[in-house]
Every structure is written in structure tokens, then in C-alpha cells.
A protein has these predicted regions:
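Glycine-rich phosphate-binding loops that contact phosphosugars or nucleotide phosphates
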Residues: 28-182
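Glycine-rich helix-loop-beta junction characteristic of Rossmann-like nucleotide cofactor-binding loops
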Residues: 20-27, 78-81, 200-201
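Generic macromolecular interface patches on structured domains
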Residues: 9, 13, 169-172, 196
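Short, flexible loop segments at the rims of nucleotide/cofactor-binding pockets, characterized by
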Residues: 8-12, 64-67, 93, 184-191
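An N-terminal, well-structured beta->alpha segment
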Residues: 1-31
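Short, charged low-complexity intrinsically disordered segments located at boundaries
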Residues: 26-35, 83, 187-198
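Cofactor-pocket helix-loop regions in the catalytic cores of large enzyme subunits
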Residues: 15-21, 176-201
Length: 201
């Protein structure tokens, strides 16, 4: 089960993730968070941003969903040198030219840049660039989430779940209970696929 693997991976890194975010929060009065992705990966940020804007004080943590194509087209509009920024890159392969270019531009343009790289491919360029960078938190997704097909069902849902786990304010035990319930619900739905197919036919 991809979601269980994603949660287990998060749980193993939970202390490091919390320390990473706390260090940023303690150092800066205002932090801009950019959820960035190319293609379907961009929709992860689009989906999550309204929720995080609701639960965070935007005077401290300001969440934004910006497609990498938009950042590359107008970098100076989205990346400000004097604004502490957490660039959260969502990427299935981690090799999209605009995703790689977004990271390069952010490094050039933002003085206080932090990164969280959420990707499904350990061998991708984004994952490789994150290695050894203390200001870049690499969160690799389960190998099974690296969809080979056109539809990015596993990668999309896995990356979205990980981002929720990273930024949600709930305690670990609450998160674990919610993920368990989510997995059970999904299994119930999948268990009814045959019944639905019979009705359709």
C-alpha cells in the first residue's frame, strides 16, 4: 500500500522535518512557501494551498501554489531576494526542465532559500541535487508511486499526503489515525469496484 509506505517514510523522518521547519520559523518573522510543480504535479499545490491558508497565520507562513512554468516565465514576480522562501518541489521524475530551472532560479534570486523536495524518483535531478544540502529536505516517495502510465494517480496522492503530513499542525498520533482511516476507506472503495462494474454492465 503506497499510502502506508508514504506515512512510514514520513514517520521515520518526522523529527528531522519538525526540526527543519522550527529552525526556519525561529529565524524569520515571515516565510513565503511556494508549492511548485510541472504538469500534474502542480495540481498538488493547487489542492493543498487553500487548506494551509486556513490553518496558518498568513502573516507568518504565507502559502502559495505557483506552477514551475509560471516561475520560469516570470521569476522576478515570484522570487524576491529579501523574502525568506521555502520552495516545495513536487515532482514524479524530478527531471522536468522547468522544475530544475525553478530550483536554479530560486538559488540565484533568493537570499534565504530553503527547499523541501518531494519526489518519486531517487535518481531524478531534483533528488540528486538535494543530496548533501542541509537547506534542502529530501522526502522520497515509495518506489511504487513512480507511475509509468499517463495518469499520475499514485504519485499525485502520495506527494499530496506527504505534504499534508509535513505541514499539518496535528500531533503524530492524530496523523497516524487519520492515515489509517483513509487507507481503510480507500480499501472499502476498491473492494466495491467489481460490484460497480456489474451494475454498469
Amino acid at each position: 500500500e503506497v499510502w502506508q509506505e508514504a506515512f512510514d517514510s514520513y514517520k521515520a523522518q518526522a523529527a528531522d522535518i519538525a526540526a527543519f521547519l522550527k529552525k526556519i520559523e525561529d529565524k524569520h518573522d515571515y516565510i513565503k512557501v511556494i508549492f511548485a510543480g510541472a504538469g500534474s504535479s502542480a495540481y498538488v499545490g493547487d489542492t493543498l494551498t487553500p487548506y494551509f491558508r486556513q490553518i496558518y497565520d498568513e502573516r507568518k507562513w504565507n502559502f502559495n501554489a505557483i506552477a514551475t512554468t509560471d516561475i520560469v516565465a516570470n521569476p522576478l514576480v515570484h522570487l524576491k531576494r529579501e523574502v525568506p522562501t521555502v520552495l516545495v518541489s513536487f515532482a514524479r521524475s524530478g527531471n522536468s526542465p522547468e522544475s530544475v530551472a525553478t530550483v536554479d532560479l530560486a538559488k540565484q534570486l533568493v537570499d534565504d532559500l530553503y527547499q523541501i523536495t518531494i519526489t518519486c524518483a531517487a535518481q531524478g535531478k531534483l533528488a540528486q541535487q538535494a543530496q548533501g544540502d542541509e537547506k534542502n529536505l529530501l522526502l522520497l516517495q515509495p518506489e511504487a508511486s513512480n507511475d509509468a502510465g499517463f495518469a499520475m494517480t499514485s504519485s499525485f496522492s502520495s506527494m499530496m499526503l506527504t505534504a499534508i503530513l509535513v505541514f499539518d499542525r496535528a500531533e503524530l498520533a492524530q496523523k497516524e489515525a487519520k492515515v489509517a482511516a483513509l487507507i481503510q476507506l480507500s480499501q472499502d472503495v476498491l473492494g466495491r469496484v467489481a460490484d460497480v462494474q456489474q451494475l454498469v454492465e
